[in-house]
A protein has these predicted regions:
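Short, hydrophobic/π-rich interface segment
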Residues: 102-125
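Conserved small/polar residues in nucleotide/adenosyl-binding loops
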Residues: 126-132
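RNase H-like nuclease fold core
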Residues: 27-63
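Short, well-ordered amphipathic alpha-helical segments that serve as non-catalytic structural scaffolds
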Residues: 67-82, 115-118
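Phosphate/pyrophosphate-binding loops at sites that engage ATP/ADP/AMP, CoA/4′-phosphopantetheine
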Residues: 82-89
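Short, well-ordered beta-strand segments in beta-rich or mixed alpha/beta enzyme
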Residues: 36-40, 93-102
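Basic, amphipathic N-terminal segments that precede the first structured/catalytic domain
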Residues: 1-19
């Protein structure tokens, strides 16, 4: 597997600072020696780069994909802070995504792909996840 940081740099992707915690929880918890459990991350990158609204009403699929992408960037920032090296991450087992959408909106998987593609594409984790949407 290629160096994650080299791939991010080639793609022009900069990890944000880990997001501020919104409550009493641990962003990344170690379970044994080889498993990390991550709390959810929202789309706010802490620099005004965020997405707010309801898909199918206020937001387009592309807006939702940007939100999902931002969520994964925040997740990677938390993992980087916890592990000290994203190259130690070998696989993502599951992605749980909550998509704020109108009742008649049916493109939640395409929205979530905005984040999943960051894991499977530029970051190049070879084993894809089991998504729950």
């Amino acid at each position: 597997m290629r160096d994650v940081y080299e791939v991010l740099k080639e793609k022009g992707i900069t990890l944000p600072q880990p997001p501020a915690k919104g409550g009493v929880y641990t962003p990344v918890q170690e379970l044994g020696e080889k498993f990390l459990y991550c709390s959810g991350c929202g789309p706010d990158l802490g620099n005004g780069n965020t997405v707010v609204g309801k898909l199918g009403k206020d937001l387009t699929v592309e807006d939702g994909q940007k939100a999902a992408y931002n969520c994964v960037l925040n997740l990677l920032a938390n993992l980087n802070e916890k592990t000290g090296d994203l190259n130690r991450i070998k696989r993502f087992v599951k992605v749980l995504a909550f998509v704020n959408s109108a009742d008649d909106f049916g493109m939640q998987p395409q929205v979530v792909n905005g984040g999943s593609n960051l894991i499977a594409g530029p970051v190049s984790y070879t084993h894809l996840t089991l998504p729950t949407i």
